[in-house]
Every structure is written in C-alpha cells, then in structure tokens.
Amino acid sequence: MSITTPRILGIDPGLRVTGFGVIELHGKQLVYVASGCIKSNDKESLPERIKTLFAGISEVIATYQPNQAAVEKVFVNVNPQSTLLLGQARGAAISALVHADLPVAEYTALQTKQAVVGHGKAAKDQVQAMVVRLLNLPGAPTADAADALACAIAHAHGGQGLGAMATAGYRIRGGRLIG
C-alpha cells in the first residue's frame, strides 16, 4: 500500500458486536482487504465491554494500517437505554480511531444504504448482497461486517451513492448495479 492509496476502515458500532471492514481504493476500483466482528461479553461490566471494543479496534488498526475511517452514526432508538449503550460503544470506537490519529467521517445508516444499495430503506440482506457484488467477495460477510464494509464503501465514494459509482465506471440501471 502506498501512502496515497486510501485504505478505509469502516465501523458498524455495537455494544455486543462491532463490525469492521477494511477496503482500499485503487483509482476507481474498490479492493477488499479484511472484515470481521469484535464481540464483547455481555456478562462483563460495561467498562470492561467498552475496553474490549477499544482494544479490538486498536488491534484492527495495528494489523491493517488504515489511513481513513468511517463510522456509522447512532440512530435514536425507541428505548433510550439502548441508544445510550450504543452511543457508548460508538464512543469507544471513535476514541480508538482518534487515538491512532485517523481522520473519522460519520455516516447515518440511511446515507450508507443510499450509497451502496441506492435507497435508504434497504434491508440487511440487500446491503450484504451489494457489498458482495461491489467487492467481488466469494460469500457474504456477517451482517455487522457487511454494514461496516458498506460504511467504508460509502466513504470511498464520498458518500454520494450510486451516482458516484456511475461516475467511477460502474453500470447503473433503474437504481441498480448491473453486470
């Protein structure tokens, strides 16, 4: 990887499971590097779980050496307690990224889905299918890893969705990526 090659770490934060995905942008081509999940033990205290997420993301950064990061923004849940817990997990992720001196971009789930699938109301399986297609993967990553990869893809295309992909040379018809 040269210093000019964007290597983007996408993060889908969660207290139980945080997805990560690393891609590179070679000219106009997206290249898959790695993806996976960082899991915390729900039997541990909240501070221990936050520590696990911070350490896990720090390890991903050390292993894959990204030079940019994209994180999914928190949505307001019906349950305020769930929203607060998700916000704390997101804070751990952003702290690890900033601690590694990475620039951090933030995208809502709607922006990410719009960028990858073409509409903001896409189901998780649609996001997974488009991630597989855009990155030419042999199989579908887990939902959390796919969401993280989708966030990285949205960032790679400037968060501009399928319009940016068409400009990058992808063929789009009726809001869908084709052959």
From Swiss-Prot:
EC nos: 3.1.21.10
Reactions catalysed according to its record: Endonucleolytic cleavage at a junction such as a reciprocal single-stranded crossover between two homologous DNA duplexes (Holliday junction)
GO biological process: DNA recombination; DNA repair
Record text on subunit structure and interactions: Homodimer which binds Holliday junction (HJ) DNA. The HJ becomes 2-fold symmetrical on binding to RuvC with unstacked arms; it has a different conformation from HJ DNA in complex with RuvA. In the full resolvosome a probable DNA-RuvA(4)-RuvB(12)-RuvC(2) complex forms which resolves the HJ.
Cofactor entry: Mg(2+)
Function comment: The RuvA-RuvB-RuvC complex processes Holliday junction (HJ) DNA during genetic recombination and DNA repair. Endonuclease that resolves HJ intermediates. Cleaves cruciform DNA by making single-stranded nicks across the HJ at symmetrical positions within the homologous arms, yielding a 5'-phosphate and a 3'-hydroxyl group; requires a central core of homology in the junction. The consensus cleavage sequence is 5'-(A/T)TT(C/G)-3'. Cleavage occurs on the 3'-side of the TT dinucleotide at the point of strand exchange.
Cofactor: how and how many bound: Binds 2 Mg(2+) ion per subunit.
Gene Ontology MF terms in the entry: crossover junction DNA endonuclease activity; DNA binding; magnesium ion binding
Family matches, as PROSITE patterns: RUVC
Protein source organism: Dechloromonas aromatica (strain RCB)
Keyword Nuclease: yes
Residues the entry annotates as binding Mg(2+) 1: D12, D144
Amino-acid positions noted as binding Mg(2+) 2 in the UniProt annotation, renumbered to this chain: E72
Compartment annotation: Cytoplasm
GO terms for cellular component: cytoplasm; Holliday junction resolvase complex
Protein name: Crossover junction endodeoxyribonuclease RuvC
Keywords: Cytoplasm, DNA damage, DNA recombination, DNA repair, DNA-binding, Endonuclease, Hydrolase, Magnesium, Metal-binding, Nuclease
Family: Belongs to the RuvC family.
Residues at the active site: D12, E72, D144
